[in-house]
Amino acid sequence: RQMCIRDRGIYIKYDLPQVYHPVSRKPLKPHYLLDRNIAILKLFPGISPQVVESILNIPGLKGVVMETFGSGNAPCEEWFLNMLKEAVDRGIVIVNVTQCRAGSVEMHRYETGHKLLEAGVTSGFDSTTESAVTKLMFLFGHGLTPDEVKEHMNCSLIGEVSIPETFRP
């Protein structure tokens, strides 16, 4: 899949031939049912248990977009994986996206990805952080359960994510 955005930063340069054009010319229908109980957990070398715990224990939190390294790698320390699992067990949906400017999360590629899957983390594939946050806000805003949200995170609603053929049910 080619990227629609050629370059991003303060200014966005679009690769216009790649921009999604809907088949229908219906008027824009904004969605206002958004749940803002979402957080971003940006991983960095040496992240402490206190930082992770403070984010995962935000009152009312429903979803976390976790920015990982490379193709979805994260620390493998027991405290970290336990905190993620405990949050998932409480019904918090954790979505794994890459911090890289391009690329995709491949949780089956490395041992760290397998451990995240075991903890209940959901792949964001090639979603951007912003796209994953918005999608979580939309899905929770429409009253979906955590399991339903996870299921919808594994499919493209409007072209916001590329799901590998090998992953599709």
Each predicted region: which residue ranges?
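Accessory alpha-helical/coil subdomains and C-terminal extensions
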Residues: 2, 6-71, 76-77, 155-169
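C-terminal non-catalytic interaction/assembly regions of soluble proteins
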Residues: 68-169
